[in-house]
């Protein structure tokens, strides 16, 4: 009797310990797992998972403790998988002879059974009462479940209770049914399963209310749980239990595959977000006003053959936003003005402020608020050429800096308005002075030299090298001291290296366009040289390049002037009558010879602009001229003509000497410009012969039709071998001044 009382007291103590976690859960969130203790030793059963109809024999003990390897799952339940976790343990009831820790999903045997770890049958019930009503009566729940399943109360363990996520007024209770032996036999397991499935386990409805069985799992039971969950198969052919929602297994680890998928998905999501943000930022920048245009450096759009096609009708209809997107890579280092500022500066573009008008717009004189005088070019033609010219001119002028090039101060892009703001050159253009006023001889020479310097800079020293393509008298502006400035770069194109031409649609002004460009569309730097030669003839003759008021056959300046360059009488007839008695005939003849070569029909016979500059510097001594951007080693290496001594270097084919024979009765020292169709380096390796040395003073300026090369590091190849005062007899060089009034 005493032993029975002790046993009963021990059972009550164990039930109290079992109910303690549920009571303790009132103080903490119900989703937390119960705290478990660990023991230093544990003994495990090796359960036999093969189904057996016969009752299970008594468990056999192993003398040495061993662990059961984790079982691999094959089934699914609510799309979740379970694994045996070694760090999640179930505490076995304390007894006087057994202390051990079991690894889930195993649990310790009930009190009174040999120590070991077995598979429990996991049952999940949904009670229609609140959790706080369950905690005080967990012991009664164990008793009623045990009675309804024909088990001992010690075989029923309440593992957890929590409020239902969908209805807080209901309670989810997780129950473990533990076999007394190694496992439930199939008959017992099936019987328990059927009683729960058909709700034949009676529970006190007054205390627990109605209940639903949401999940049952145990190896050997049918593959479907009461709510349709499908179980897997454990090794040995038995279905393996899948996780019920209990406190003991809520903290399962996440598999490596799941972690990898989550990480990869996050990375892809980040990339998508970054790309979307970049696109949004880009479009916001494009949509900003013109004040957002900042300096940048990019290749010229004119280098692309299809530059004109970039302005489609749809792009033109989108206003300034389209242009801003096209100019996103343009080289802009200029100020941006608003349309209101320009309207105020030009009296709302008053006709009284018009300085001139070209093919693409008008130029207005403007006065800014700070007193700066500017020239505002308003593009008026509303077509694709307008925007193309605008971008071309901004690109060119923002990168070109030379004293003989007009300076771009700023731009304006607002709606459909396009404006270029230049420094104001007060003294008008060469055209206005030639045909509406007068220019003395010195001013004309100064203009010729300065304009040549500007073109030489474009062709040889700028980066990239530029072909102006619309050089004419109206595009050469004059300062008060008649210093010329080349303007209007709307048709400019980037020059290619070497002697290759650029195939392009013919653009320019009648009378100034080179014949090869007009006939074939092949554009070269020598095409600009031809245009310069026409302007030089204008300076000499005072006539327009095309004048329909002239007699028949004399409308074209070049056609009319060419035969007049052959003799003295022709030169006297050609020169502007307004210059009578104000010029030196020898200087005029030299300028005429330069002009004749510049407008030569053959491209290879035209000089380069750098050579024209050197020739003009020998004719016109510009004392006030300081060395500009174009100056290089070649400029400083040329001595003044008064210091020439010695003989001239050989010149077998001089481009100067290719001029027509001139006959006039006065000896004159002349310049011999040596032309070579090969590279510059070949000039110094050409054989010298006595017969090839002319007996006239002058300077050899080599010309070449080969590829363009940087001029800054070019060696000095001007050779002086004579005196300007010497006028020897004829030599073997063709078309040289003989001293007898003839060109040999």
Curated annotation (Swiss-Prot):
One of its GO terms (molecular function) is kinase activity. Residues 1-19 form the signal peptide. Disulfide bonds: none annotated. Keywords: ATP-binding, Cell membrane, Developmental protein, Differentiation, Glycoprotein, Kinase, Membrane, Nucleotide-binding, Phosphoprotein, Receptor, Serine/threonine-protein kinase, Signal, Transferase, Transmembrane, Transmembrane helix. This is Receptor-like serine/threonine-protein kinase ALE2. Glycans are attached at residues 87, 186, 204, 243, 249. Disruption phenotype: Various epidermal defects, including disorganization of epidermis-related tissues, defects in the leaf cuticle and the fusion of organs. It comes from Arabidopsis thaliana (Mouse-ear cress). Residues 59-79, 681-705, 722-744 are annotated as: Disordered. The active site is at 470 (proton acceptor). It is an enzyme of class 2 (transferase). The gene is ALE2. Residues 59-68 have a biased composition (Pro residues). PANTHER family: OS01G0750732 PROTEIN, RECEPTOR-LIKE SERINE_THREONINE-PROTEIN KINASE ALE2. It is a single-pass type I membrane protein. One of its GO terms (biological process) is protein autophosphorylation.
